[in-house]
Every structure is written in structure tokens, then in C-alpha cells.
């Protein structure tokens, strides 16, 4: 009987302490408000427009290079200049090389721009699109850098062996054409991937995996099964998840404090 009395007294003390707790006096937050505040907002990647513009600039440059260089391949060019002097006072090769340098700088700026936005997407929890375009978003710049190396090699050889001048111009135009084909393939593939990502408007990878595990259809049932193939990918994926969860928890804490102070303001 004494033990039962002590148990009843302790339960009454707990209930009284809960009633006296000021944190529990606040009104419960409405479910629809929490759902609206904590639902992750999708931010599309804005790199598609810049990629399309750069693709157009590249095509225009190569077309102008051919329109300027092909007349110089006709018989009797005067001192490696076109008869019409399209690029006067510069030589044709000089104008093409300068245009190629400007195009490379644009690709360098584009690569930095893409890296910046992809890092932001990765911090929001979309590590899958970051990994799937890791090499693709830098491949166009690598192709242009390789083209610059080939052009530099041609200019060095031409400096030592100036004749025949037509052959070097033909090789320069061939390098530009090959570079255009490879670069366009990379940019088009990148644009298609990013457009699909923007149209799909997926949830962060953590929430997408929760949906898959909540409604398993074709997933393997073995314990410890992972779809990634290497330990490095597993560690990188876990790192991305931890960074996203830390950022998400900080955002949730901030919004909870804002919602909790709203009844007091009113």
C-alpha cells in the first residue's frame, strides 16, 4: 500500500511539473503550416540558357572561320592574306587564333559558372545530378584546351617550316571542325541532362530514397544491399547526406523558432 501511494504521488508530481512547464503552454503548431514551411523548395539549375548561348557562339565562330579561311585556300593567295582582305590588317590565321582564344575564355568562365551552381545544388541534397555530370561539365573545356594545344603545335611547326602555308590553314580549320563536333556533343548531352532534371523537379536524394524504401518495388531485399558499386562512392554519398541533413536541421530549427514566436506576437 505504501509503495502504491508513493507511485501515485510521483505520477501526480510529474503531471504537475508538466502543467507548470512554460514550454508546454504554447499552442501546438498547425500541421498545414509546418508542411508548408518544411517542404523542400526546388531550385532549377540556371545553366541551360548559358550553355545554349555558348553553343550558338561556338557554331557562329566556326562558320565565320570557314567563311574567312576557305577563300584563302584558293590559288595565288598573297602573303597568306585573302584577296578580299576580310581580316585586314590581321592575317587570317591571326584572326582565327584570336577568336579561338576568346572562345576558350568564354568556356573557362562557363565552367566556373557551372561549378558554382552545381556545388549549390549538391549542398541542397541533389548529389546524384552532381555526380552524374561531374566529368561532363568540364569535358568541353578540356576539349578546347586540347584544341589550343594542337593549334599551338601547328603554329610552332609553321614558324620553323613556313611552307606550304595552305596546309597549315587547312589543318587549323580541321582542328576547329573536330573541336566543334566534340564540344557540341558534350554541351548537348549536358543540356539534355539538366533539362530533364529541371522538368522532373525531384526531391532531395535523401527524401527520394525514403520514398523508394517506403514503397519497395524492385529493390533488393538482402540486408546491407547497396546500389553503388565502390566504397569511395558510398563514402561520398554519406558525406553528401550528412552535409544536407546538417543544413536541413539548421533550417528547420530556424523556422521552428519563427513559428513558435508567431502566437506570442499576435
From Swiss-Prot:
In-chain residues carrying the UniProt-annotated modification Phosphotyrosine: 213
Coiled coil regions in record: none
Gene Ontology molecular function: any one: protein homodimerization activity
All ranges on the Lumenal side of the membrane: 68-89, 159-171
UniProt keyword Flavoprotein present: no
Membrane topology: Multi-pass membrane protein
Cytoplasmic face residues: 1-46, 111-137, 193-266
UniProt KW keywords: Endosome, Lysosome, Membrane, Phosphoprotein, Transmembrane, Transmembrane helix
Localisation: Lysosome membrane; Late endosome
Any single Pfam family the record assigns to this protein: TMEM192
Entry-annotated residues carrying Phosphoserine: 17, 229-230
Main location: membrane
Transmembrane segments: 47-67, 90-110, 138-158, 172-192
Entry annotated with the keyword Membrane: yes
Annotated GO CC locations: late endosome; lysosomal membrane; lysosome; nucleoplasm; perinuclear region of cytoplasm
Subunit-level organization: Homodimer.
PANTHER family per the UniProt record, alphabetical: TRANSMEMBRANE PROTEIN 192 (PTHR31592:SF1)
Family of the protein in this entry: Belongs to the TMEM192 family.
Record protein name field: Transmembrane protein 192
Organism: Mus musculus (Mouse)
Lineage: Eukaryota, Metazoa, Chordata, Craniata, Vertebrata
Underlying gene: Tmem192
Amino acid at each position: 500500500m505504501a509503495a502504491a501511494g508513493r507511485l501515485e504521488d510521483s505520477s501526480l508530481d510529474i503531471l504537475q511539473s508538466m502543467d507548470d512547464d512554460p514550454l508546454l503552454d504554447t499552442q501546438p503548431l498547425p500541421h498545414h503550416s509546418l508542411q508548408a514551411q518544411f517542404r523542400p523548395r526546388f531550385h532549377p539549375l540556371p545553366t541551360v540558357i548559358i550553355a545554349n548561348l555558348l553553343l550558338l557562339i561556338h557554331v557562329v565562330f566556326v562558320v565565320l572561320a570557314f567563311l574567312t579561311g576557305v577563300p584563302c585556300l584558293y590559288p595565288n593567295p598573297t602573303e597568306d592574306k585573302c584577296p578580299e582582305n576580310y581580316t585586314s590588317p590581321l592575317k587570317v590565321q591571326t584572326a582565327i587564333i584570336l577568336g579561338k582564344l576568346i572562345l576558350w575564355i568564354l568556356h573557362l568562365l562557363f565552367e566556373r559558372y557551372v561549378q558554382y551552381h552545381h556545388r549549390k545544388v549538391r549542398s541542397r541534397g541533389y548529389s546524384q545530378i552532381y555526380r552524374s555530370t561531374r566529368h561532363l561539365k568540364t569535358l568541353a573545356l578540356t576539349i578546347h584546351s586540347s584544341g589550343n594545344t594542337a593549334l599551338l603545335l601547328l603554329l610552332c611547326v609553321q614558324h620553323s617550316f613556313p611552307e606550304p602555308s595552305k596546309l597549315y590553314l587547312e589543318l587549323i580549320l580541321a582542328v576547329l571542325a573536330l573541336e566543334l563536333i566534340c564540344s557540341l556533343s558534350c554541351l548537348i548531352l549536358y543540356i539534355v541532362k539538366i533539362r530533364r532534371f529541371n522538368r522532373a523537379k525531384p526531391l532531395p536524394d535523401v527524401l527520394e530514397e525514403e520514398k523508394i524504401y517506403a514503397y519497395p518495388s524492385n529493390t533488393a531485399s538482402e540486408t546491407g544491399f547497396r546500389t553503388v558499386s565502390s566504397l569511395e562512392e558510398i563514402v561520398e554519398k554519406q558525406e553528401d547526406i550528412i552535409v544536407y541533413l546538417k543544413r536541413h536541421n539548421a533550417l528547420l530549427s530556424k523556422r521552428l523558432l519563427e513559428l513558435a514566436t508567431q502566437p506570442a506576437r499576435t
